[in-house]
């Protein structure tokens, strides 16, 4: 038995698994342990089916492999849209059109001033159209992320229920192992059994215990993946909300400036400052996003 199963390794797995299912109360009764022992003794070659019938597994419909990749590129889409928004805002700066707010240019070179003003209005119209599309794209991304979060929440619930069932089963196997490995069998059943027979039963219990622990550890890893994905998506939602708010602010500025005339040229002073503030805000958002993205790489299984 010890040549095929490393008992020390199993003990380590048990310690890890117990920590994972710490929330599962050990309420396995002595009668449950006795019932399992009797079944294994009476039908030693049917241990696989005995264990299978005892497992109280909740169906854990983990669609990780099928779905996680469809959400893995959301971060790249968010970053791409933020950069597009940043470019839109930067293109609105009057400084790119020989400073429309420059009174000297307006007074001494009115034709150049009017030409620059026309160019600015043309750019503003184009940017306004781009902002409308960007806002639509951001909203669509929010819908995708919301769907992703629903998927994550469902899987977290499934895994939690799955671990609860596995935790109860784990406690049963641990107690059965304790009985068989510490000469307590006589407290439950007829002890006049060949030692080799008892060792074979112990082997089957240890093998099942090892599998149970490995599954619990694997499910715990899945939970960490889901939590990571959820945290990442929440961060994306924050970035998208900020981006949409900035887009709406600039969009409103463009609406206000669509009827620009000489009397209202001073408004460009405020627009320039607000635009630069928006540029800085978006730049900071992109920088923060990249830092988070580096800390939380896309997870695959």
Question: Where would I find each of the regions flagged by the language model?
Answer:
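Leu/Val/Ala/Ile-rich N-terminal alpha-helices, chiefly Sec-type signal peptides and the beginnings
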Residues: 1-156, 160, 167
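Aromatic-residue detector
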Residues: 70-72, 76, 165, 172-174, ...
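Alpha-helical scaffold segments that mediate packing/assembly in large oligomeric complexes
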Residues: 157, 161-185
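Long amphipathic all-alpha helical oligomerization modules
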Residues: 174, 178-301
